[in-house]
Amino acid sequence: LVGSEMCIRDSTTGVYSILDVEPEFVARQMDCVFQDIFPDAIKIGMVSRPDIILAIAKKLTEYQAQPVVLDPVMVSTSGSRLLKEEAVDTLCSRLLPLAALATPNIPEAEILSGHPIENREQMETAAREISGRFGTAVLVKGGHHTSDADDVLCMDGKIRWFYGRRIDSSNTHGTGCTLSSAIACGLAKGLSM
């Protein structure tokens, strides 16, 4: 599913400004896509306002769209808060329950679980809590750890680790968005999680 909920002024070094589009535009945009070629998977990235989140959730429900991969973009790589405070509750109550998979990074998983994450055990605990609370598979991305880039998946109460080597680069903006998009593409092709 292709759609734009906002215009973002950013580069490989960070996000500089955000301009939201109106929820009515988002809803009409989703109608255009769903009524033309029904998508085999949906990936949702950054949405910053409750009214836009509600519009997206309404259309996903109306069209019974699945699978949904939700990258709950709340905190940038540089640590800036991207999701408005009042939108977190709406994201949790309306979008997360519709997702087949949520892919928070560590700071986002801390917000969703309400607990600090400083080690692998806490990553697992957060993944289990988020998965259980919202009824979705959860992949906590560990790239924000300084020593490794290991990710943990909680699906149906089971834990699976994916081990990765940290790449020393200053140009890593958007890696989580790329991962969630790749997962959505795999699901669209019929691959299982």
Listing of model-derived features with the role each one plays in the protein:
Residues 1-2, 6-7:
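Short, small-residue-biased leader/transition segments that mark boundaries at the very start
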Residues 85-159:
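Conserved phosphate/ATP/ADP-binding segment of small-molecule kinases
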